[in-house]
Amino acid sequence: MSTQIIFLFGRPGVGKLTVGELLSADTGYRLLHNHAVVDLVTSLFSFGSPPFVALREKLWLDAIDACITAKQSGVIMTFAPESTVTDEFIPTLKKRVTARRGALRFIELRCDDAQLETRLTAESRGKFGKLRDVNQFRQLDKDGAFDRPKMPAAELVVDTTGRDPLESAQLIANHLRQAGVNPRRRRKSS
């Protein structure tokens, strides 16, 4: 079976990392966390600068290429659309995954604005360089910062508002199994 790239995307605060970690535990797929790449690149270049944008996208693409080459069964990549991502990134990712006979599956997480703003201030977001300022989020949102790049239609949309993250991860895992992907089920430890 081809390497499955589960592209878990949504606005800041919808629960991508939490759901991604739980989905990884359930499926056995590796997790490529957006901020692992972003934090590395911001240690070298200012966020949004041309070298930052170029290196971040190169690392994302090279990481996915390496997983496909290594015949990993699956990779969960978390992603937040935002204005410093080039419009070419998603089409380039699709072409590269397809050329290597991988499968790219877009799964969107959503959350209502009130809960999203509550989540943004969570202490756990400080572990990575995640957006935690509600006023900054509102301004960025008003300015359209999260409206690009244009995302393809998701094959599954999960509303995480008021939903336990484990339930969200299980919805995704069950969707993948029903689609014939059949990731392994998490083994319970004794």
What are these regions (language model features)?
Residues 8:
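Hydrophobic anchor at the beta1->P-loop junction of P-loop NTPases
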Residues 11:
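P-loop (Walker A) phosphate-binding loop of NTP-binding proteins
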Residues 18-68:
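Conserved substrate/cofactor phosphate-moiety recognition/catalytic segment
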Residues 55-108:
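Glycine-rich phosphate-binding loop used to anchor ATP phosphates in small-molecule kinases
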Residues 118, 122-171, 182-185, 190:
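Small-molecule kinase domains that catalyze NTP-dependent phosphoryl transfer to phosphate-bearing small molecules
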Residues 60, 64, 165-176:
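Short, amphipathic alpha-helical "lid/cap" segments that border enzyme active or binding sites
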Residues 15:
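Conserved glycine(s) of the Walker
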Residues 98-121, 158:
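Conserved phosphate-donor/acceptor-positioning beta-strand/loop module used by diverse small-molecule
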